[in-house]
From Swiss-Prot:
GO terms for biological process: flavonoid biosynthetic process; polyketide biosynthetic process. Its EC number is 2.3.1.74. This is Chalcone synthase. The active site is at residue 167. Pfam families: Chal_sti_synt_C, Chal_sti_synt_N. It comes from Callistephus chinensis. It catalyses: (E)-4-coumaroyl-CoA + 3 malonyl-CoA + 3 H(+) = 2',4,4',6'-tetrahydroxychalcone + 3 CO2 + 4 CoA. It is an enzyme of class 2 (transferase). Keywords: Acyltransferase, Flavonoid biosynthesis, Transferase. Belongs to the thiolase-like superfamily. Chalcone/stilbene synthases family. Pathway: Secondary metabolite biosynthesis; flavonoid biosynthesis. InterPro entries: Chalcone/stilbene_synt_C, Chalcone/stilbene_synt_N, Chalcone/stilbene_synthase_AS, Polyketide_synthase_type-III, Thiolase-like. It comes from the Eukaryota. GO terms for molecular function: naringenin-chalcone synthase activity.
Amino acid sequence: MASTIDIAAIREAQRRQGPATILAIGTATPSNCVYQADYPDYYFRITKSEHMVDLKEKFKRMCDKSMIRKRYMHLTEEYLKENPSLCEYMAPSLDARQDVVVVEVPKLGKEAATKAIKEWGQPKSKITHLIFCTTSGVDMPGADYQLTKLLGLRPSVKRFMMYQQGCFAGGTVLRLAKDLAENNKGARVLVVCSEITAVTFRGPNDTHLDSLVGQALFGDGAAAVIVGADPDLTTERPLFEMISAAQTILPDSEGAIDGHLREVGLTFHLLKDVPGLISKNIEKALTQAFSPLGITDWNSIFWIAHPGGPAILDQVELKLGLKEEKMRATRHVLSEYGNMSSACVLFIIDEMRKKSAEDGAATTGEGLDWGVLFGFGPGLTVETVVLHSLPTTMAIAT
């Protein structure tokens, strides 16, 4: 029988010493680009709803206030004309939606993952774990299995499939990747979030304006990151360290954001006070996350917040007294891609590190050392990840 000392030594050898680190990032979108200024006319025309004049005006105002310039969508006008059930508000259409997402979600994820692996520069055989996250459909074997096949990963790669989590899940996947990387020596975790709105697209209804809000905000996109602890600086270039990660359900928030998979697809329900609920509770989450570091000035850290919509960002800024530039990367991604659910925060990390390098900032976090990543979504669930940036000049050692 092994002694306690032997077991302790084995356990110590299995774990890493340093924090989990983001080593590479890749993103991808469908080729079909939709400009927000044109979208109300297109949306009401393709759904044969132009007779709903007042509702169209409301939708135009939603789009105008969305702070979105463009989005990417797999669903083209041609496909929607061939599948008119997707354009109705409550027509049975799940089969047609599933036919799209079970194929296209892994494919879009592959595009993002391929870019991340290329930037990482290591053989894909070194990937030990795969986390795949999507709110777009469900299937068995899952999108994680399909991506393993598409990428040619080892059949022994340890897979985790997360379906139907929602917009907070960009934080969830990083929290899980952190635990995997830090507790498995030599682990290199491929994280992929891939979202396609084919499961939520539907025509307008004047009694359910919350559904219309989703039509004004959501876009398609996939993002991938490679996560590992104790990077090999001769071959890997670390971007951000993950110092802590937490999840909480906000008080008195049940029913604030719901999604239900039905014969008609994934229906979306939203209460008006979501921005208020988030802004009311965000400082408590920040204080709990940053008190071990002695940080209380929220303008002294960099910000990566899920852009659920402009009202959420506005109220968070107001509540915390944030300077306008704090949400620059977040608002840029919202403007150029819309709300891509779980993939958004990974797009924002990518935007921040690229802009930091372009601007000659000292670190990947806009020149600052510490930052926060927030994910918000159904529950209301909030994910809080504390990030430590690294020098933008950090090159692979030779």
